[in-house]
Every structure is written in structure tokens, then in C-alpha cells.
Amino acid sequence: MDPRSEVMLRQAELFQGPLLIAGAPADGLLGQLPKAHGWTWHAGDQALLESRFGNRCHHGVGVPEVAFDAAILFLPKSRELAAYLLNALAARLAGRELYLVGEKRGGIEGAAKQLQAFGKPRKLDSARHCQLWQVTVDHAPEAKPLESLAERFELPLEDGPLQVVSLPGVFSHGRLDKGTALLLEHLDGLPSGHVLDFGCGAGVLGATIKRRYPQSQVTLLDVDAFAVAASRLTLAANGLEGQVISGDGIDAAPGELDLILSNPPFHTGVHTDYQASENLLKKSGEHLRKGGEIRLVANSFLRYQPLIEGALGNCEIRAEAQGFRIYRATRG
């Protein structure tokens, strides 16, 4: 069980009523709290929770429309996302209890200070390298629309500026990361047809391809509901159309693709997690047409070339700069 869940269950008597667990981990916590509902923005966690707890699990970027008398937030990695979520929960909890649980290395002590906007927070427990905090919401805020927290910026590209809309919690929020910037410089000679932007984040790659090759069918895929929402906003800001889907890894992608583009993720929260990236590399051939291509950027220290060669039988390094490499391979 997640150590944060274990700390929460040390105070189980506090959580026996109607409760919303925001950022619910994919463990057995809901089974211990029969009146609780879970809310997650991670597609993989949602699938696991739904298989065990059915309609007590909710997925998306907004607070679920269910009744609850208290809520607890499992602290996310992003401080901006935590602020949005705490505000959204506190807006529904005037005079009631809001809890926050997180790992010490995830910044729980600093994040707990955000509770001061709603009342007088107090630490209830500290164990398993985690802390549990509580505040009675004496000052309920107005809920802020998610779009009001969007960061909008312009990318100067060869074919004109691209408008990018990023949301709290999305990778490289409010700026272009170095890896994607390098990949944008090496999008020459791409095959046309059905293109997948895997781990799309704010949708920079997918939007760039759709504008540059308007006849292409572009699908954008991310495990995170906030990234899915940001990608849709980025497409709309540029007058572009594309299919944006929420799913856990390459298994959620369509087949018969002509091109997979990616700056694949290797973090889950504060933890390093290479599973999604390694599955992408190992299974890319199952989703590509014959002659289809995968082109991606990754940190130079990651040993991705052997995985790509093992899956597709070939792999070339197209470029290397600033600690990143561009890999290209085709399905024979």
C-alpha cells in the first residue's frame, strides 16, 4: 500500500463519512473506506481503481459531482497543481475539513502552508516519511476556473508562431523544454499519414505537425488528464483539429500508425519511472505500419538505442546536443 495511504489509515476514524480522495493512489485504500470516492487524473490509476471499486472512482480535471463532507488531497509533484486542487476542494467545503497528505521529499511541509489561506492548519501525524495535515475551512474561496491558471506562450517556428497553452501539472509548464526544442529542429523527412504524439503534454509536437502537414491525421495521447486538456486548448488556440485521448501508455494508442513522435516521460510524481517509455520502445512495432517510423528525443544517459534496435532491428542517432539525443527507427 502507498505509504501516504498507510499514514492516512492511522487516523482512520476521521475518514468514515462521505469523503473525496483527490489524487487517489491505485491501492486498496478505497476498500478500507466504504463511504469514500476516489478522484484521479491519471488514466492508468483510474483503470485500476475502476476495476476494483467501480463507480466510486472518477477521472478528470474538475472536482467530481458527488456528495462529500470532507476531502483529502494526496500531494502532487507540481506546486501550481496543488494550489489549484486545494482551492477547488476548499470551495466545496465551507466549515468542513480539508486534509493534505504527502511525502516529506515531495515537499509536504512547504505545501501545508497553502492551507493557511483557508484556516489554521495543524499536523495530525508524521510516519513513513510522510505527513498528514488538516484544516477546517473557515475561509472558503471561490473556485477558480482551470483555464484562468493556464500559461500561454508563443513558439517562434519557421512556418510562423505557434500558440501553446499549458496547465498546472503538465510537463514543462509554461515553457518549452530543451528536449522538445531539439526535436522540433529535426522534423525533416517525416512520413505522411497517421501521426501519434505520445506523451503529448501541452501538445506542442502534435500541433506543430498538424499545422505543417494539414492532411495528416494527428492523435495526441497522454496519461494525464491535465495534459489532455492542455493539448486540446493548444490545438484550439491555433485553429487546428486533432484527436486527443487519455490513456496509459502505448497500449492505449491506435494501430496502423505511420509515425510516432515523442519526448517520452520518465517520472511519475517525485519518483523515476521508465516503464511507459520502455514499453513504447518495445511495442512501437505493434502500432506502426510497415515502413512506419518512430522519432523521439531522450536524455543522452538513457540507454534507449538497444531497446529500439531490439524492437525494430534498426536505430540511428540523428542528432545530439545539450545532453539529448534524437533517435530514429523504421519498421521493416
UniProtKB/Swiss-Prot annotation:
Any one cellular-component term (Gene Ontology): cytoplasm
Substrates-to-products reaction catalysed: guanosine(1207) in 16S rRNA + S-adenosyl-L-methionine = N(2)-methylguanosine(1207) in 16S rRNA + S-adenosyl-L-homocysteine + H(+)
Signal peptide: none
GO molecular function: 16S rRNA (guanine(1207)-N(2))-methyltransferase activity; nucleic acid binding
EC number: 2.1.1.172
Domain of life from the UniProt record: Bacteria
Gene3D superfamilies, per the entry: Vaccinia Virus protein VP39
Localization in the cell: Cytoplasm
Class of enzymatic activity (EC top level): transferase
InterPro entries in the cross-refs: DNA_methylase_N6_adenine_CS, Mtase_sm_N, rRNA_ssu_MeTfrase_C, RsmC/RlmG, SAM-dependent_MTases_sf, Small_mtfrase_dom
Keywords, ordered alphabetically: Cytoplasm, Methyltransferase, rRNA processing, S-adenosyl-L-methionine, Transferase
Oligomer and partners: Monomer.
Function: Specifically methylates the guanine in position 1207 of 16S rRNA in the 30S particle.
Family membership noted in the UniProt record: Belongs to the methyltransferase superfamily. RsmC family.
Record-given protein name: Ribosomal RNA small subunit methyltransferase C
Species in which this protein is naturally found: Pseudomonas entomophila (strain L48)
Gene: rsmC
